[in-house]
């Protein structure tokens, strides 16, 4: 009942904000209406420079009504819901993910990087950046060369995000790729290779945690998670975050 209008005493009044970056499985492609909406008045999202009540789709990088891949349910809503319930604190989501993007498009100085920095700095006028959530890598899996160069690029990207956003210990939470992605996408063995790289990076990037996607179902398109799986994935992201900060 926490999110249904019941008054609670916050442990703290600070808004905790989280930057959402990556490609479509961070933005969210789950079908709207397949899962109950999350209604929690302590969860917010950045819209037009202001905190608005959280409502999906949170990261509308694509059309909501038209096209093959529509914006929809993602992992961030259940992440925010779990955070607010655990810590009795308001949460703000900063949606900056963009479907189909490669990590090269996120490098420091790129449009996507600069947009994420700008939106986060705007958000942190009225919040504290408490973490960066990243889900990306499918776009690299068509190329052995891109997979081989991924680790260095992500390591540098995390450093750049942190240096621009004022803290080298901002938690960085990232997720595996599904190894059930349909063969029609042409990713082959590189998905498993990428997950191996992620595992190594989780040991190399300080204050980071890797999230398993084992057992999560995919939509008929063979690459995006189902709405129910996004809900579970958001909980897994939160649990990874919670374990990480409990060690600090």
Q: Across the structure, where does each feature detected by a protein language model lie?
A:
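Cell-envelope and extracellular/periplasmic
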Residues: 1-248
